[in-house]
C-alpha cells in the first residue's frame, strides 16, 4: 500500500541545510518520522553562503534518492529562507523537541 501525503495530518518538521544529506541526517529522519508518520523537510536557502555548495534542486534530489525507497509519499521537501532563529509565543497545538541521537551518529 502506498502512502499519500496529507497536509491536514499532524506533521513533524525537519529544518536544515543538508549540505550534504548524510547518514546522520537519515538516522535523525527515521526518529522524527516516528512522531507523526510524515515529515516536512525544509531546506534552508544557503547555497553559496560559507561552506554550502549545493543548490536546492541538488539537495532535494539527494534526499529523495535516499528516502524514497522506504518512505516515498511520507515526506515533503520545501525551500525556505535562511532561517537562523526559531521563535514562538504561545504553544498552540505543537511541540518543540530536540532529538538526541547516539554519540556515534552525532559524530557523522
Locate the predicted segments by residue:
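Nucleotidyltransferase catalytic core that binds NTPs
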Residues: 1-108
Amino acid at each position: 500500500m502506498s502512502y499519500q501525503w496529507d497536509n491536514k495530518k499532524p506533521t513533524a518538521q525537519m529544518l536544515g541545510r543538508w549540505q550534504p544529506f548524510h547518514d546522520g541526517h537519515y538516522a535523525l529522519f527515521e526518529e522524527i518520522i516516528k512522531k507523526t508518520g510524515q515529515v516536512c523537510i525544509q531546506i534552508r536557502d544557503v547555497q553559496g553562503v560559507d561552506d554550502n555548495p549545493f543548490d536546492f534542486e541538488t539537495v532535494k534530489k539527494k534526499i529523495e534518492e535516499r528516502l524514497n525507497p522506504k518512505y516515498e509519499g511520507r515526506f515533503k521537501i520545501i525551500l525556505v529562507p535562511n532561517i537562523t532563529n526559531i521563535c514562538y509565543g504561545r504553544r498552540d497545538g505543537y511541540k518543540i523537541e530536540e532529538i538526541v541521537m547516539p554519540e556515534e551518529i552525532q559524530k557523522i
